[in-house]
């Protein structure tokens, strides 16, 4: 968890609002230790949207590594039928787990940087422009075809995704500038551990971030991709990364074999039932009431909230996300 102070609503039980939970400190107290896995756009950040949550969050830098995709969200008025024409409401813009977490971090009052390989096509330029407008510093090589993800959203807000990651998995260790890893927290999309050379880039990024005293977190991402990759093989990838915090939904949690042993702190995303945090203490927080328009990106908003301000901010950010169409604030 980023080194920050959170002030505002009632503190979590057992700590004041300005304390950093000990379970979220880096594995190595001096910032080094693990062998495996800056925002300059201040002008853009002043114009970026902010989500009204807590009164004061000291500015920290959350760096993410993974995908910066073109996100096409299709909210269906009725179920699809082969050969038929179904009504829908659509929205397109920047997406991808790494991009989403960085954008939400900025919206919640932090600084956000996203490390990703981007396409040099129209989709890539659109994504880069939108992230910049949101105050996110997008860094990494550009070339080839940008990834696109299509999310089909039903009336209940649940989504089904079709993902084309484009050039994103081609990010290599040699593409990294150590300056990008001067941050408070490095958040790695689990998709980055499912392909090469981006997995090696993730491990190298974690090394560099820890040299700067940062914590490292990972979101296990899609259980279907983990199943295809091999759960035991994927778990080994996470173990090599040695994260301080692991995020997972319940399906991902189960398929990897209960992720608690993978990190000092585990955050289980339970949808409408809220969040479960396992560390030195067990903490359950319910989801906040409200209409669910679109669940796309809710887990990313939750992760950003947790890294910036802890569990309370996590559930608030998730509630903000599901109340609108699209994955970004």
Question: Which positions does each model-derived feature cover?
Answer:
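Ribokinase/PfkB-type carbohydrate-kinase core domain
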Residues: 57-68, 129-141, 153-283
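N-terminal helix-forming leader/targeting segments
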Residues: 1-19
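Conserved post-catalytic alpha-helical subdomain immediately downstream of the catalytic base
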Residues: 107, 265, 286-329
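Polybasic, low-complexity intrinsically disordered segments
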Residues: 18-42
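Glycine-rich phosphate/adenosyl-contacting loop at the front of the ribokinase-like
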Residues: 56-115, 122-129, 149, 289-292
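Short, positively charged and aromatic/hydrophobic N-terminal segments
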Residues: 23, 53-57
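Basic polycationic patches enriched in arginine
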Residues: 3-4, 15, 27, 50, ...
């Amino acid at each position: 968890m980023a080194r920050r102070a959170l002030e505002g609503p009632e503190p979590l039980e057992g700590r004041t609002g300005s304390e950093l939970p000990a379970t979220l400190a880096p594995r190595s107290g001096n910032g080094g230790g693990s062998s495996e896995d800056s925002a300059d756009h201040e002008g853009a950040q002043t114009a970026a949207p902010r989500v009204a949550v807590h009164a004061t969050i000291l500015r920290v830098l959350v760096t993410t590594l993974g995908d910066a995709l073109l996100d096409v969200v299709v909210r269906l008025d009725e179920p699809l039928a082969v050969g038929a024409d179904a009504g829908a409401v659509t929205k397109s813009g920047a997406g991808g787990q790494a991009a989403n977490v960085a954008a939400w971090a900025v919206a919640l009052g932090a600084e956000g940087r996203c490390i990703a390989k981007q396409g040099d096509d129209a989709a890539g330029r659109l994504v880069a422009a939108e992230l910049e407008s949101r105050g996110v510093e997008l860094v990494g090589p550009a070339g080839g075809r940008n990834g696109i993800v299509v999310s089909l959203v039903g009336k209940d807000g649940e989504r089904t995704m079709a993902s084309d990651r484009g050039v994103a998995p081609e990010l290599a260790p040699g593409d990294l500038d150590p300056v990008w890893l001067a941050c408070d927290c490095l958040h790695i999309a689990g998709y980055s551990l499912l392909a090469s050379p981006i997995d090696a880039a993730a491990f190298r990024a974690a090394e560099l971030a820890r040299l700067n005293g940062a914590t490292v977190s990972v979101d296990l991402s899609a259980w279907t991709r983990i199943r295809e990759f091999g759960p035991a093989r994927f778990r080994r990838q996470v173990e090599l990364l040695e994260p301080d915090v692991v995020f997972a939904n319940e399906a991902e949690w189960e398929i990897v074999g209960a992720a608690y042993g993978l990190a000092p702190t585990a955050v289980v995303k339970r949808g409408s039932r809220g969040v479960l945090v396992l560390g030195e203490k067990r903490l359950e927080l319910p989801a906040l009431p409200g209409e669910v328009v679109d669940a796309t990106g809710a887990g990313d908003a939750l992760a950003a909230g947790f890294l910036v301000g802890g569990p309370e901010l996590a559930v608030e950010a998730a509630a903000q996300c599901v109340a609108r169409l699209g994955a970004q604030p």
